[in-house]
């Protein structure tokens, strides 16, 4: 609009200039009255042009001021929005960080008592007097721990006395006191080391498994923690059929038919998960033989793992596995 007005004013100025240049010739031709009348119009028009020019100058200044004010408001709004977005992002990240990615869903049809210990969480089953599962995050720094092994098996004081398994319940049973959370994973903290020797973290395992394939897998998990930055681990017993062997003196402790372990890495861009099932037997078992998908372990146990990660990511990494990706 401003450009149009300026263009019209220029045309009008040119017309006035042309008239001024030719008006003497018009007087000589007997057009003096017309010239006098036109002079009055030109004078008024010139005044209008000056007024409009002044107005446009003031308006331009006002527009410039308004534009600067609007720009300032927009910049401040954008900054405020960016600050709010950053705050919201930090809160969201804090929420994700605070979630324990290793924890499975609560069990619906199995007795469980959730027990928190230093470095790990477990779900205890009062019918089997074993953990349903034990879960923990193992970081690269924790996997490098150097504390000595505690080796003092104790009843778990966080359980009711009538379900506190003792060291004696395993004596001469023919089974090892098999750690679910291994002592070597807890060498980063003395309290964590002591807590993992509570009998609530123990299941009856054959010596061949405890000192063989299971121990090999435990060592691999520590290596993966150093490699990936951290891993999330869940493991526990597997029961098959309705009849099970039991051990124990004061308490009846069910001997599982097997054991599962699932491992998750959330290394950005290389997220992956893998599952393992080991029979509780004297047979030699390798990771190549026992590796499977997390989905298969979920079908075997009835548990739902890694529920706190994105659903699409969970579906993708739980439905397939590659042991080579973990080497």
Where are the predicted features?
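Domain-level detector for secreted/extracellular nuclease and nuclease-toxin modules, and
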Residues: 2-327
């Amino acid at each position: 609009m401003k450009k149009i007005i300026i263009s019209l004013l220029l045309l009008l100025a040119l017309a006035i200039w042309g008239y001024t240049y030719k008006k003497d010739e018009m007087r000589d031709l007997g057009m003096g009255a017309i010239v006098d009348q036109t002079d009055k119009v030109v004078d008024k028009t010139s005044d209008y042009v000056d007024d409009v020019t002044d107005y446009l100058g003031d308006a331009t200044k006002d527009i410039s001021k308004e534009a600067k004010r609007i720009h300032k408001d927009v910049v401040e709004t954008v900054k405020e929005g960016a600050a709010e977005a950053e705050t919201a992002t930090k809160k969201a990240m804090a929420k994700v960080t605070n979630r324990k990615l290793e924890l499975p869903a609560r069990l619906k049809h199995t007795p469980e008592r959730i027990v928190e210990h230093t470095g790990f969480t477990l779900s205890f089953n009062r019918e089997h007097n074993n953990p349903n599962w034990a879960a923990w995050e193992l970081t690269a720094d924790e996997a490098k721990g150097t504390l000595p092994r505690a080796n003092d098996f104790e009843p778990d004081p966080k359980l009711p006395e009538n379900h506190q398994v003792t060291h004696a319940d395993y004596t001469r049973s023919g089974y090892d006191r098999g750690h679910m959370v291994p002592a070597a994973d807890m060498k980063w903290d003395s309290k964590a080391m002591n807590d993992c020797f509570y009998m609530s973290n123990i299941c009856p395992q054959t010596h061949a498994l405890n000192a063989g394939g299971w121990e090999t897998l435990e060592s691999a998990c520590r290596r993966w923690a150093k490699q990936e930055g951290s891993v999330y681990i869940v493991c526990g017993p597997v029961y098959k059929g309705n009849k099970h062997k039991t051990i124990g003196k004061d308490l009846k402790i069910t001997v599982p038919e097997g054991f599962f372990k699932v491992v998750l890495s959330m290394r950005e861009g290389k997220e992956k998960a893998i599952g393992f099932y080991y029979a509780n037997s004297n047979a030699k078992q390798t990771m190549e033989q026992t590796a499977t998908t997390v989905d298969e372990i979920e079908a075997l146990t009835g548990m739902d793992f890694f529920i706190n990660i994105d659903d699409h990511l969970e579906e993708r990494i739980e439905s397939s596995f590659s042991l080579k990706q973990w080497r």
